[in-house]
Amino acid sequence: MPPANARPTWLLAVGDHFSRLSEDVMPTLIGSPARIEAAGNKPKIIEEFIGRVNSRHEALSIAKMTSPQGWEEPGQTPDFEEFTIVLKGMLRVNYRGGHIDVRAGQAVISHSGEWVRYETPEEGGAEYVAICVPAFAPFNVHRDEAE
């Protein structure tokens, strides 16, 4: 049995940042997200709370996305896992074998090295939270070339 003050193993696995924490470190408030430009055919709002831009974390990123009806982005083969929780509407995740419609209250995991393309085809668009491990960056998303 681990000692009472041991950190959970999942926390240590997320990245070196967490394993370096000491007991005298206090919580860090993220006062507001950074707005990041989104890829796609229509404007989409990306609010990064934790990640390379807003908090200088490379181990993971957490962002809230708001995309309009009819938004779609180029396909990608990322070097990260993306864990997505849909808060409102429906997010369609296209993959080589078809697509998955992820609705409010559901989640989906897109795996590193697998091709995916996201879109929000239904009325009202979608609002969702994406967690990427390691953190999202333009250099590790590997978007499809424009045709």
Regions found by a protein language model. Give the residues of each.
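Short histidine-centered beta-strand/loop micro-motifs
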Residues: 51-52, 72-78, 95, 119-121, ...
